[in-house]
Amino acid sequence: MVKHMFLEDVNNLISDDKWLIFQNEYNTEVNPRYETLFTLTNGYMGVRGTFEEGSEGERSGNFIAGIFDKSDAQVREIVNAQNWLRIKLYVEGEELSLDKCQLIEFKRILDMKKGILFRSMLIKDSKDRITRIEGYRFISRSDLHRSAIKLFVTPVNYSGVVGIESIIDGTVLNSADSPKHRVKHLKVADNSSLNKSGVYLETATIDDDIRIATGSAVRLYHYEDKEKNNIAKFKRFLPLGEMSIEYFEFDGTENKTVVIDKFIITYTSRDVKKGLLKSTVEKELFAFAGEGIDKELQRHIEVYEELWSVADINIEGDEEADKALRFNIFHLMSSVNENDPMVSIAAKALHGEGYKGHVFWDTEIFMLPFFIYVHPKAAKTLLMYRYNMLDAARKNAALNGYKGAQYPWESADTGEEETPKWGFDYMGNPVRIWTGDLEHHITADIAFAVWEYFRATEDIEFMLNYGAEVIFETARFWVSRCEYVKELDRYEINNVIGPDEFHEHVDNNAYTDYLAKWNIKKGLELINMLKEKYPEHYHAISNKKCLTNEEMEKWKEVEEKIYIPYDKDKKLIEQFEGYFDKKDYVIDKFDENNMPIWPEGVDITKLGDTQLIKQADVVMLMLLLGEEFDEETKRINYEYYEKRTMHKSSLGPSMYAIMGLKVGDHKNAYQSFMRSANVDLVDNQGNTKEGLHAASAGGTWQVVVFGFGGMEIDKEGALNINSWLPEKWDKLSYKVFWKGNLIEVIVTKQEVTVKKLKGKGNIKVKVKGKELTIE
């Protein structure tokens, strides 16, 4: 336990060790990784885990969902907004700098149960004065606009004047550490004092004049003073250009603790009209400061308690896996705003600037299953983002010469294609990025996600009013995307990139072709369902979308004749036409994190000439459409492609773990699971500093529930449980929503127990092939 390091008030807040992630030393080399690990977010805003006082080499970040700007960047990117964390301390004028003073003690703790970041340190300055600083901060999950910092400052061996600078810093940049790419997305619109009781900084984005308004107020008082009387003997407001600063001084007394409460309110012009921003922030700020931090903190903790009551998974017998899984779940469920259907979850969530804050297929295929089964309201909101971007997808299809709706590979706030045209290869050479032009499978991925949500929730209102249109318009795209080859009497999808991005400009990628076929077929099935059960809705949508019998016949023809490169005798699916003709390498060496090492002789600038792949492709297909393939086909393809997958994307290990369990490769499945679970905790991709691997977090949950927990939906739409536990696991328990009912599944080596916790009516579940009725 670590509680001896903290004051009693802080001790009482900290959860048990299984909920805690620790940083035990200050190190500028690894700090950027901890900044990502210790990011706090409520889905509306994410603030990286930098230090209040700042530090050398930090990557500060304050990201607000839905706030994008292009300015001088290649494409629209999430804006790094003004930094409100800053609190600098001075003793008799000398700054207590993490990089210039001596750190005698140091610890930071992320409390995942409560969504709080704790800190404690003992610091000695150049005059040998020792100061203890401890405290915590949180971004409220109850009121999304509220954040707070509480610090306890104790002069250990001196008395003297202590100064405090509370800063809202608008000098922030995107890509600040890269002279080649850094961009300024904000200009200051207002920097002012709030009735001498707080400060206000309002910024505006360069392109669209979106306003971001931040207000902060500081309260100083002695720790023992229950009345919290102000002890500042000097106070000054400094509107220094793009920084809004309050400076305070108080008389520090040896071994007497002073409390610094910093209250922060954030609003944007997405929330309220520009003319009302300042008055809204001021009103909310003083209401918050008047109430105090404790009440908001309690409400915040209660929201997390409610979320964890469904989301928490217990693994008994494997503490490392148990905590790593909890870490992934914490960040995933913290990253969604279930009340805003105009935003989604980016590939790096709100944890960093990686991938420019863009939304990929990661959300629908890797993250969404968690929300479907744990937080269905949030899942619906994420799908509504795609529905709300449907017009942009139609525009995208038309621009590319197709019909229907073609979703962009990278999406931001407008729904238009935001993939950069240029990037860098593994050697740092500039390369053309083709994913935005060619990685079309995302369109089918989104349709697939719509159907998966419907299967699990039976939310017919969503399907009738929103989901059906997405499936129809994406099916229409695929019919126009397919090319008819007369001499072979088949339809092909040529010049694409599949999930494996080592190979570009390929023809008939099996994943893409199969998902396109599925998308068109599902569109036809849905039309028949609507005709039969909801004729009024069918007539409305068919009139709106001009669905004709002639077009439906075309859909049937294309769906039946789409070509899949599949040798049914060998049962081996060729990833794309010509893949087996590439130079073959087999992976046989791994690094200290059990990640593959490039085979000897590989030219990593010409990976497209080899059979090495970046991530799961054919294996991914067999997971999504598992009912289409028999067990032997799955095993043969898993064994072939597993040896050739470099896992240069964090998306791969979780998928190989699930498939490994399905085909009996239990040892490698567990290793793949731990690769996925630890991707950020041990930084096995080497880029955690750029932000959370959010898709891997979702994939990690899938491995435990769909893999070890054995949960799947069969062809008939029934819930199946076919579990398998690793040797060191004694018990696994998880909860999911299934068609409006909350159920708990408890798995041991001896038995599987399924309980209904909430809901009406009986539930039928197949446990290891035996049908049970759960009352």
Swiss-Prot record:
Q: Which domain of life is it from?
A: Bacteria
Outcome reported for the amino acid change (mutating residue 403 to Q): Retains 74% of kojibiose phosphorylase activity
- Name under which the protein is recorded: Kojibiose phosphorylase
Its organism's taxonomic lineage begins at:
Bacteria, Bacillati, Bacillota, Clostridia, Thermoanaerobacterales
What does this protein do, in the record's words? Catalyzes the reversible phosphorolysis of kojibiose into beta-D-glucose 1-phosphate (Glc1P) and D-glucose. Can act with alpha-1,2-oligoglucans, such as selaginose, but more slowly. Inactive when disaccharides with linkages other than alpha-1,2 linkages, such as sophorose, trehalose, neotrehalose, nigerose, laminaribiose, maltose, cellobiose, isomaltose, gentiobiose, sucrose and lactose, are used as substrates. In contrast, shows broad specificity for the reverse reaction. Various monosaccharides and disaccharides having a glucosyl residue at the non-reducing end are effective acceptors.
Q: Which Pfam family, giving just one, matches this sequence?
A: Glyco_hydro_65N
The entry's active site is 501
Q: How does activity depend on temperature?
A: Optimum temperature is about 65 degrees Celsius.
> Gene of origin?
kojP
Q: What is the effect of changing residue 284 to Q?
A: No change in kojibiose phosphorylase activity
Top class in the EC scheme: transferase
Q: What is its EC number?
A: 2.4.1.230
Q: Can you tell me which residues bind substrate?
A: 361-362, 614-615
Q: What is the effect of changing residue 114 to Q?
A: Retains 85% of kojibiose phosphorylase activity
Task: Give the result of residue 459 to N, as annotated.
Answer: Strong decrease in kojibiose phosphorylase activity. Increases KM for kojibiose, beta-G1P and glucose but minimally affects the value for phosphate
* GO BP annotations listed: carbohydrate metabolic process
Q: What is the effect of changing residue 271 to N?
A: Retains 70% of kojibiose phosphorylase activity
Q: How does activity depend on pH?
A: Optimum pH is 5.5. Stable from pH 5.5 to 9.7.
Q: Which residues form a coiled coil?
A: none
Report activity regulation.
Answer: Inhibited by Hg(2+) and Pb(2+).
Catalytic activity reads: kojibiose + phosphate = beta-D-glucose 1-phosphate + D-glucose
Its keywords, alphabetically, are: Carbohydrate metabolism, Glycosyltransferase, Transferase
Q: How does it assemble?
A: Homohexamer.
Naturally occurring in which organism (per UniProt): Thermoanaerobacter brockii (Thermoanaerobium brockii)
